[in-house]
Amino acid sequence: MTNQFSSTHFLNITENSEKQRIDNFLRKTFKRLPFNLICKIIRTGQIRINKKRINQNYKLKLGDSVRIPPITIQSDSNKKIKLNTRLSIIFNNMILYEDNYFLILNKPSGMSVHSGSGINYGMIENLRILRPYNRYLDLVHRLDRDTSGVLIIAKKRSILRNLHEQLREKKIKKKYVALVHGVWPDILKSISKPLLKTSSRKNKNIVKIDPKGKESITHFNIKKKYTKNTLISITPITGRTHQIRVHLLHLNYPIVLDAKYGIKKLDYFIKNKFNINRLLLHAESINFFHPKRKKNILITAPLDYVFKTVLKNLI
């Protein structure tokens, strides 16, 4: 089947769309277009803003005129995404809180929050298709694919901007729980080590401790000690990529079943005893100021069955 956007047309940027990256704006506006095609037409200059070429990092300004060229795409009807009743039920069961401004979910481990790196549809893309009545849906923050827990989605652009401002000003408080290898010492309460994002052939994003990196601070509290493991509560003061996982590895208390920053030989016992392969890191709660209700909101996400089963049966 061939789908066509048959003629050149222009979009004028309003207040609801300003400050977005052009690639994200186009992905939300033209949901049928594959993201790699969006990147290509930007890169080749087919997308113009105010008659000028731009790159995909360009942030839209109020009043910008975006030129959209004619586009033809081939689609295989057998490969259409099937968002059936079962998937709708799965997403509905994730809901922790919802009002006219926010949708807050308990994200399962193993589910990507957005497309990219070989994933055509993440949670946010699926939600936009499942919920056409929500004119605007966007991620306030991100969680790693393997991390479970609280995920906030904004229903209005103005709400997204407000929450991003709260994040920048460190007014949003997040707490995580993790099962780590080793018996955690009572005196260890925090770590402050700079983190630098690098790349390698095997992994696109690898984060390491480096003096050239950004300031990164994480606080810890013990929840429960086991014979060879500890369940800890974690409060990241800064919000760097993979911050918790890298800091814990540096302290020699890696998270159980962390495929990227863990230690496989330590994971062997739990992996085989419980027949699991998920990172035991969970975004337990988030506390933020609701800009419309004018009060603080605390959202808590319960652990899933797998995580609870491991804790229940550990000695």
UniProtKB/Swiss-Prot annotation:
EC no. given is 5.4.99.24
Q: GO:BP terms for this protein?
A: enzyme-directed rRNA pseudouridine synthesis
Say which enzyme class the record assigns.
isomerase
**Which keywords, in A-to-Z order, does the entry hold?**
Isomerase, RNA-binding, rRNA processing
Q: Where is the S4 RNA-binding domain?
A: 20-90
- Gene Ontology molecular functions: 23S rRNA pseudouridine(955/2504/2580) synthase activity; RNA binding
InterPro entries, alphabetically?
PsdUridine_synth_cat_dom_sf, PsdUridine_synth_RluA-like_CS, PsdUridine_synth_RluC/D, PsdUridine_synth_RsuA/RluA, RluA_PseudoU_synthase, S4_RNA-bd_sf
Q: What's the catalysed reaction?
A: uridine(955/2504/2580) in 23S rRNA = pseudouridine(955/2504/2580) in 23S rRNA
Indicate the family of this protein: Belongs to the pseudouridine synthase RluA family.
Described purpose of this protein according to its UniProt entry: Responsible for synthesis of pseudouridine from uracil at positions 955, 2504 and 2580 in 23S ribosomal RNA.
Record protein name field: Ribosomal large subunit pseudouridine synthase C
What are the top taxonomic ranks of the organism?
Answer: Bacteria, Pseudomonadati, Pseudomonadota, Gammaproteobacteria, Enterobacterales
| Gene of this entry | rluC
